[in-house]
């Protein structure tokens, strides 16, 4: 069957485009690299082989010529086209497995759909093709569905199934349709709104939505938070089999609170919680062994757990032997304020500051936070219930050493997460953990799981140019961001309705909370396109304004749903929202740029309610940023030359904006190549290559995450925290000193600063750039992608 399709003649239009593209590459001066020729009437298979040979030959040269990087991406899109099939075959493909309602909706509007796809080929698709090689490969290898005979879903069909799914479930709720479009509400208007936002890469769905949207396979939720009542192996096994296993098999990322499994090793149970962690590790590895999307688990513990030292030593070289090594799962410290208060006392010079560990006799501490936690913890210490006591600086060192050497634990601030939740958790029992990537804050218990559905706004698509007759530079269009936020709100709500969920407890969590996780990607790219250094006051101001507008328009859309007759989320009457409180009210010194809009929204929420309980979560966008060629999430770029190993080999992704700037500064080819040689010798660091350039120099803004002051990056997270009602997956980027000795105090000082600034996530990954690093950041190094969009 594969031979039948691939052996057919490739459409002449595709062959013509390939020849045109190759001729353009030759005009760049790369004729010698293109010695192979394409047969006069090639088959599809011959076209695939030819493009693969050409791209493989040119890939290494992308590091010195951004034009090749773009051209290779265009060639890969032509390779994709050579594998595309017609709409009729796609609709009936058993591998695509479209849901009945999606297939029926397409057939009912087939003329409009075909017209939309034809328009896409000559408009949005041209822009997509010119993004670059990594974007094209990511679509080809991961997101476009495979069919028998070597066929591949087309880009238009990919966006079609997502837009149709969202349209169908939006049309089932007239209020959702009315929020999405003004004026006439009809299927074609709703479809066009979704298709335009998706194909234009303004709204970027999470990876599960891109993989499974519109299909009768998989779940579209990204994040699951579990807090089963697990106290020993007897209660742990059912939790693993009934909740963890099904979610992992559906490719969901899991945050799992296990603090209550806190019986220290005894003769009857010689390994304590480590036996459970080893089982969980093996389960995760087994499920990932045959999946197209790796998944993961992060286990949450508080630092007073009896086995905390063993937990912190479970990965990599720190594990004493294979029986306790757990390299397939992560850990996160769910840290109370008291820990950092005591560490600060040590830093201030006070001696003898200890940290006490407790077993399950203190399990009730899990349900407490703030002053209540502190009082009870200290009472238990005075009463002698502790099983061990460690100098606070030693405990801090163990945490930091593990993070630096193994990439785990992450660290979150328990009290801040509970303090800023939309319910008063003092009456409900404290939140005990987050998700896999530390950006989702939801209450979970033995009756329901926390579940979050994600999407991000591609910020570079919110830039606009002045009218043609007016001189000026690009500017950030807040109206475009507002429209994108509202569209994303309706889109994710529609996908929430469309999705199935792996377990009953997960379904209940979705139905009762309707939690959205809207984030951003391309923040650093946006600054660069606006000619702003990330450290500039203008960038810091824009950073806050973006977060404010995202929250405002998402909440406004959700409140309007209730205003139009939909019911608020369960428990709204008991939430802070019902009292007119908004997320930023709990933060000091917040300046609003949309004060009147917030005042009107506050009134509407009190009167009508909110359809969703949560809105904004700044997630990592490791995977989806590859298809947009934007910087990941809210982080600066890691390097100016990114290396990504894919199914087709290594791909070098240059910083295209930097490369274009260098080309404009050095128009002579010999001077440009010399500048790139200098940059490569300096490990792709502009500062290392050209020194401290004056402010305003075209190259001065191209710093990497490792070159920025980490305190400043933490401050940027804190500046927008008032408008992020969930949390932010904030990583630290540390450069190792030349002598290779990295003091733990350097990282602890950053964690203390994050704590003092009131963040909820103190550290997602701690990324270390070794003194011997060549400046090429390798994708996959200690990076979890399962819930990273």
UniProtKB/Swiss-Prot annotation:
Annotated site residues (Interacts with thioredoxin/glutaredoxin) in this chain: 784, 787
Keyword match Oxidoreductase: yes
PROSITE patterns with a match to the protein in the record: RIBORED_LARGE (PS00089)
Disulfide bonds: 223-452
Organism: Equine herpesvirus 4 (strain 1942) (EHV-4)
Catalytic residues in the record: 435, 437, 439
GO BP of this protein: deoxyribonucleotide biosynthetic process; DNA replication; release from viral latency
Assembly mode: Heterotetramer composed of a homodimer of the large subunit (R1) and a homodimer of the small subunit (R2). Larger multisubunit protein complex are also active, composed of (R1)n(R2)n.
Top EC category: oxidoreductase
The protein's name: Ribonucleoside-diphosphate reductase large subunit
Keywords, ordered alphabetically: ATP-binding, Disulfide bond, DNA replication, Early protein, Nucleotide-binding, Oxidoreductase, Viral latency, Viral reactivation from latency
Database matches in InterPro entries: HSV_RIR1, NrdE_NrdA_C, RNR_lg_C, RNR_lsu_N, Rrm1
Source organism phylogeny: Viruses, Duplodnaviria, Heunggongvirae, Peploviricota, Herviviricetes
One MF annotation (Gene Ontology) recorded for this entry: ATP binding
EC number(s) from the headed UniProt entry: 1.17.4.1
Binding positions for substrate per the UniProt entry: 207, 222-223, 253, 435-439, 620-624
Family per record: Belongs to the ribonucleoside diphosphate reductase large chain family.
Pfam family, one: Ribonuc_red_lgC
Function: Ribonucleoside-diphosphate reductase holoenzyme provides the precursors necessary for viral DNA synthesis. Allows virus growth in non-dividing cells, as well as reactivation from latency in infected hosts. Catalyzes the biosynthesis of deoxyribonucleotides from the corresponding ribonucleotides.
Site (Important for electron transfer): residue numbering on this chain: 764-765
Positions of the record's site feature: Important for hydrogen atom transfer: 223, 452
């Amino acid at each position: 069957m594969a031979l039948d399709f691939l052996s057919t003649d490739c459409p002449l239009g595709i062959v013509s485009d390939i020849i045109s593209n190759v001729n353009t590459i030759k005009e760049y001066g790369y004729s010698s690299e293109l010695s192979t020729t394409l047969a006069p009437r090639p088959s599809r298979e011959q076209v695939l082989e030819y493009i693969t040979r050409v791209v493989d030959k040119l890939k290494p040269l992308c590091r010195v010529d951004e034009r090749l990087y773009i051209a290779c991406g265009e060639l890969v899109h032509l390779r994709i086209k050579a594998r595309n099939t017609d709409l009729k075959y796609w609709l009936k493909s058993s591998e695509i497995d479209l849901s009945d309602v999606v297939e029926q909706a397409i057939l009912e509007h087939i003329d409009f759909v075909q017209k939309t796809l034809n328009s896409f080929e000559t408009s949005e698709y041209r822009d997509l093709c010119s993004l670059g090689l990594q974007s094209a490969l990511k679509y080809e290898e991961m997101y476009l569905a495979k069919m028998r005979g070597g066929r591949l879903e087309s880009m238009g069909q990919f966006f079609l199934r997502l837009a149709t799914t969202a349209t169908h479930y939006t049309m089932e709720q007239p209020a959702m349709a009315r929020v999405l479009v003004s004026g006439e509400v009809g299927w074609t208007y709703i479809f066009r709104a979704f298709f335009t936002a998706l194909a234009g890469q303004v709204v970027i769905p999470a990876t599960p939505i891109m993989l499974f949207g519109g299909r009768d396979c998989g779940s579209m939720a990204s994040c699951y938070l579990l807090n089963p009542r697990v106290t020993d192996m007897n209660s742990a096994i059912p939790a693993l089999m009934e909740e963890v296993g099904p979610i992992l098999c559906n490719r969901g990322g899991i945050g799992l609170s296990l603090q209550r499994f806190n019986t220290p090793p005894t003769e009857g149970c010689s390994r304590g919680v480590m036996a459970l962690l080893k089982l969980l590790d093996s389960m995760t590895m087994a499920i990932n062994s045959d999946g197209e999307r790796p998944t993961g688990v992060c286990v949450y513990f508080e630092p007073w757990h009896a086995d905390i030292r063993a937990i912190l030593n479970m990965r990599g070289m720190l594990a004493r032997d294979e029986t306790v090594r757990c390299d397939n799962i992560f850990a996160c410290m769910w840290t109370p304020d008291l820990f950092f208060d005591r560490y600060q006392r040590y830093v201030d010079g006070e001696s003898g500051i200890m940290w006490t560990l407790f077993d399950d006799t203190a399990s009730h501490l899990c349900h407490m936070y703030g002053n209540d936690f502190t009082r009870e913890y200290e009472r238990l210490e005075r009463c002698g219930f502790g099983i061990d006591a460690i100098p606070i600086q030693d405990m801090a060192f163990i945490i930091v050493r593990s993070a630096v050497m193994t990439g785990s634990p992450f660290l979150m601030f328990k009290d801040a997460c509970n303090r800023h939740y939309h319910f008063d958790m003092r009456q409900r029992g404290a939140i005990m953990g987050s998700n896999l990537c530390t950006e989702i804050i939801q209450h979970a218990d033995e009756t329901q799981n926390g579940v979050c559905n994600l999407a991000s706004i591609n910020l570079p698509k919110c830039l606009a140019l002045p009218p043609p007759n007016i001189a000026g530079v690009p500017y950030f269009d807040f109206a475009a961001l507002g429209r994108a936020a509202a569209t994303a709100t309706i889109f994710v709500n529609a996908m929430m309705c469309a999705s199935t969920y792996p377990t009953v407890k997960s379904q209940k969590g979705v139905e009762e909370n309707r939690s959205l996780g809207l984030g951003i990607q391309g923040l650093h790219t946006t600054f660069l396109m606006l000619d702003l250094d990330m450290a500039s006051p203008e960038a810091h101001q824009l950073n806050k304004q973006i977060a404010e507008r995202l929250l405002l328009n998402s909440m406004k859309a959700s409140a309007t749903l209730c205003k139009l007759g939909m019911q608020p989320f369960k428990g709204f009457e008991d939430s802070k929202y019902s009292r007119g409180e908004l997320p930023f009210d709990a933060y000091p010194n917040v300046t609003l740029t949309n004060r009147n809009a917030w005042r009107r929204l506050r009134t509407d929420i009190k009167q009508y309610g909110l359809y969703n309980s949560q809105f904004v979560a700044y997630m990592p966008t490791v995977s989806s940023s590859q298809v947009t060629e934007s910087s990941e999430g809210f982080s600066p770029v890691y390097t100016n030359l990114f290396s990504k190993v894919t199914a087709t080999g290594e791909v070098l992704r240059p910083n295209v904006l930097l490369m274009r700037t260098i080309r404009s500064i050095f128009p002579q080819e010999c001077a440009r190549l010399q500048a790139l040689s200098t940059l490569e010798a300096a490990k792709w660091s502009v500062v290392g290559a050209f020194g401290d350039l004056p402010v305003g120099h075209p190259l001065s803004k191209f710093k990497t995450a490792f070159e920025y002051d980490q305190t400043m990056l933490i401050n940027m997270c804190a500046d927008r925290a008032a408008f992020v009602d969930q949390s932010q997956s904030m990583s630290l980027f540390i450069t190792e000193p030349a002598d290779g000795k990295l003091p733990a105090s350097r990282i602890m000082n950053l964690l203390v600063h994050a704590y003092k600034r009131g963040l909820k996530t103190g550290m997602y990954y701690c990324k270390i750039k070794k003194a011997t690093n060549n400046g090429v950041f390798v994708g996959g190094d200690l990076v979890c992608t399962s819930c990273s969009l």
